[in-house]
Amino acid sequence: MASVVIVTAPPGAGKSTLLPLTMLEWLDREAPTGRIIMLEPRRIAARSIAERMAEMSGEETGKSVGYRMRMESRTSAATRIEVVTEGILCRMIISDPTLDGVSAVIFDEFHERSIYTDEALAMLLATQRMLRPELRLVIMSATIDTAWLSKSLGCKVLSCDGLSFPVAIERADSDRISETSTSRDIAAATASVVRRALSEHDGDLLVFLPGQAEILHCQALLADMANTLLILPLYGSLPAESQRLATAPSDGHTRRIILSTPIAETSLTIEGVSIVIDSGLCRAVAYDARSGLSRLQTSRISLDMATQRAGRAGRLGPGVCYRMYSKATEARMHPCRTPEIEHADLTPLVLDIAAWGGERLEEMPWLTPPPPQSVERARGLLLSMRAIDSHGRVTPHGQKMSALPCHPRIAGMLLAATTSHEADLAADLAAILEDRDPLDPLSAEHDADIHTRLHAVHTQQRGALWQRLRSSARQYRQLLSAVSTHAISRSRHQEPQPSDAVWTAGRLLAAAYPERVAMATDDTAGRGNTATIQLMRRYRLASGATALLPDADDLTAHKYLAVATMTMRGDEGRIHIAAPLAADDVAGSTTAYDNIYWDNKAGVLVMQREQRIGRLIISSQPLTGIPLDVIHDTLATAVRSYGESMLSLSADAVRQLQQRLAVVSEWHPELCLPPCDTEAILSSAQEWGPMFFGDRTTASELRKIDMCEVVWSRLSYEQRCEVERLAPDRIALPSGREKKIEYRQGASAPVVKARIQECFGMRETPRIDGGRRPVLMELLSPGFKPVQLTQDLASFWQTTYYEVRKELRRRYPKHDWPENP
């Protein structure tokens, strides 16, 4: 058998049940003690497939065939085929990188491409390469692009036609609903199509809805038919017995309407179904920036999902599929699902790979490499949570976090609980954070305090949301009691009371959201229109961002907050759920940094020791005794960014010297003069800075540096002598005065400006560059107005001067204007 094989066959061909049993027969010959692990993405499918294989083997589930998932397991020492869900497989690989005793791993429904599936495959391909070349990997799907997958993995494809029946496609209520529709609207539209299908065709109905909320609403809308029909919900959190009832074969007498989430798309064959109603919607995992966690959001299905759904109607005979979307919408749908790794939060994946320790994440054999920016964001969070070190290696604390089957944020918060009382509170917080805000975050009736939500969880008795939150909290308490040293002993049915300690919730939230520790500033902002302006308090976060909270919110009485959920609009956020933080807890979480930087606004070098959480400065004090080389390095770095405002580079003398050197470089490239323009001076501050900075630390002091000497310092002594010889700074006039020579890069000649009387007695034009170049004389009137430009004074005196003299005598009669100057 090849090390990696792709198996493709239509839905209902027996991939999920017959193939593992056939492989077990092969193992009995090749490796009698070897085990097979089969990854099944969905809990209900994992349980159902394991039970079906056990039935086909004539055994009870848990003997030779078993299953394992979060909070539920049926296996034994005799189990040879173990069906597991995604998170479980990753945990198995991390805890035992060689998968000792496992001969083969099967990936069922691989087309779903969840992040855990990609993670597990990458780890196993690396394990195959490094430690277990004999480990067999089987990838199964009915709709995957086998050509691409085969090329990516360098393996063969085994295909089977299977048995399928024609399915007619009908359109119903096309595009009445979309991914933005409410749960009630989706349910109402679907219930209408159900009634139509019942009247037009015989057989059981399988109805695909995006989630539990739509299923329950639709079930309520169809309740009037419950006396003559069986209306059966099917979703992941439904009790196992109710799930078995929905997937059991029909009795042949009573028609059934099975209202299902996408869990019935694959692996499960429900006998009696010949009608499928496809809402065209599903719940997909997406990163939720509000909470920093991955959440499910309603989205349009892909074409391969549409094919899978329609195929459910043709498993056992001809069928019909009602699609609640138009052909135009179908044409815009993606061909297949986007791999979750491309858009999901990668924090769990990065922690898993670090805990596994097999290879660097960037070097692993990914089918779809994780986006580098998302990887770096995840590493930054894990570093702030002390889950990994600066080299990306997992810490002991990170190992504990990785062992918990929940998001690292939640794991960090659960592990921060130090007493059973805090553990209960952490479990309640985890339930609230992983679900949607149980209170309307924009309502004026509700503040942002997490304690308001905690109180509601324990006092609101009615409503599916509150029941779901309490159930989730109980699961977290069970999880924490299993892995923690906390002595949690209370009746199963006893509900813990909300915390009386106002600061505890904040400390726990800060463990989950270290980058969202916030400190109030003195700033406020107004939000809203001219009619209703709401005053907002501004907080600065450890991430460096700022966020607003209504000034009327009671939380604004606290200087420090731990922010759980927020939305960003541009560069500023809006706080929705938070808890107050005690000053002592904040002080105990800081790290000391010696910060030396140039404050360009104040024009001063700042040297202070800061107590910080991330980029949030909690306190600071002046820092003394800093070595000069450190100060000089900091100033040199600042000069590269702000140099023109720190130094006197714009002075005429500096500009003229730079022009002079540039002109000499044009005339004599063989001198190899270094660049001396402003950009070159600023970028070379590291070289000249130690000679000129001294003990200066303010802009006013730095502006006293002679920048002409800085420019000259770029040249060697020999180069400077040559420049002085070839391009002098001044020339002497017959009057005894000296005049500057103005050099301009690219000009025809350097210019000397002088009043014409000062040049009386100067027979020839002065020359520079070793006598090779005459300067351009700009002769001025007594009023300093230009009267003549010339590079040939001798000719000027003999010709043009007589005409100029007439005009000057007329305008300046009191001056002496000799005929022969």
Segments from the language model and where they lie:
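A short, compositionally biased
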Residues: T61, A531-M536, V723-A727
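Second RecA-like catalytic domain
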Residues: T17, T228, P233, I277, ...
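Short acidic-hydrophobic surface loop/beta-edge motif
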Residues: M71, V157-C160, Q534-A542, D729-P734
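Charge-dense polyanion-binding interfaces
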Residues: I106-F107, L230, S237-P239, Q243, ...
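P-loop NTPase motor module signature
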Residues: M1-M413, I488-R492, M566-T567, R725, ...
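Extended active-site and interfacial segments that coordinate phosphate-rich ligands
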Residues: D96-H111, L121, S279-R283, G292, ...
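Charged, non-catalytic accessory extensions
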Residues: A542, V606-P821
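Short, isolated positions in well-ordered beta-strands
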Residues: F165, A547, E738-K740
